[in-house]
From Swiss-Prot:
The keyword Transferase does not apply. GO terms for cellular component: cytoplasm. It comes from Pseudomonas syringae pv. tomato (strain ATCC BAA-871 / DC3000). Signal peptide: none annotated. Its main location: cytoplasm. This is Urease accessory protein UreF 2. Required for maturation of urease via the functional incorporation of the urease nickel metallocenter. Belongs to the UreF family. UreD, UreF and UreG form a complex that acts as a GTP-hydrolysis-dependent molecular chaperone, activating the urease apoprotein by helping to assemble the nickel containing metallocenter of UreC. The UreE protein probably delivers the nickel. It is found in: Cytoplasm.
Length: 224
């Protein structure tokens, strides 16, 4: 497969994993008036990129992709357990698990999934997003760095889609916000690539609190 097509396929919002159903706490941040306009939205997303994703989520995703790319199944299992244990709230755990399950079902139905990866997937009883993403990257011969870039882009695109549904934020304003955030997206990838997964960690208290509050939110559009 053409490498550019494979990358676009992985990053596409049409990938049937249900990412549009989740806001990762952003809906509650809007509900609590923490995010009220493009400026506060940019601060929220920028903080998530540099203080949470770049320090923990992205290095862990990259470790999944690197292990899957070379078929180091023991290492992949280890970082997978680390990822699973790091979900701070019920809905964040359910989000990752549901999207991982959808990716598992997708990959199992593809003829290009190689035998070793298929065997690993069949033995996986509790898939999650990072694991499925890494195996999709292996299947479509996407490098770990490109897979990380696709994951970061998908995350940003999803956050902007949430904003357009919860704020008075139009498509042109969302594109201006994208332009402002792209340098931070690049910085997040650079920082994540330099981070070892063993001491990696983050203390995103605001995200955890928003997620916990969202679990009890009376009226909501998103599952997280």
């Amino acid at each position: 497969m053409n490498s550019a097509w494979a990358l676009l396929r992985l990053a596409s919002p049409q990938l049937p994993i249900g990412g549009y159903s989740y806001s990762q706490g952003l809906e509650m941040a809007v509900e609590q008036s923490i995010v009220i306009d493009p400026q506060t939205a940019g601060r929220w997303i920028g903080d998530q990129l540099l203080l949470n994703l770049a320090r923990f989520e992205a290095p862990l995703l990259l470790a999944h992709c690197e292990a899957a790319a070379v078929g180091d199944w023991g290492q992949l299992l280890q970082v997978s357990e680390q990822h699973r244990a790091s979900r701070e709230t019920r809905e964040l755990h359910q989000e990752s698990r549901q999207m991982g399950y959808s990716l598992q079902q997708l990959l199992n139905g593809l003829p290009e999934l190689d035998r070793d990866a298929r065997r690993f997937l069949e033995q996986t009883t509790e898939p999650h997003l990072a694991l499925g993403w890494a195996l999709a990257a292996r299947t479509w011969r996407i490098s770990p760095q490109d897979a990380l870039a696709a994951w970061l882009w998908s995350w940003l695109e999803n956050q902007l889609a949430v904003l357009m549904k919860t704020l008075p934020l139009g498509q042109q304003a969302a594109q201006r916000l994208t332009s402002e955030l792209l340098p931070l997206l690049q910085q997040a990838q650079v920082n994540a690539s330099a981070q070892d997964t063993h001491p990696a960690g983050s203390a995103a208290f605001g995200l955890a609190l928003a997620s916990m509050a969202h679990e009890r939110q009376y009226s909501r559009l998103f599952r997280s």
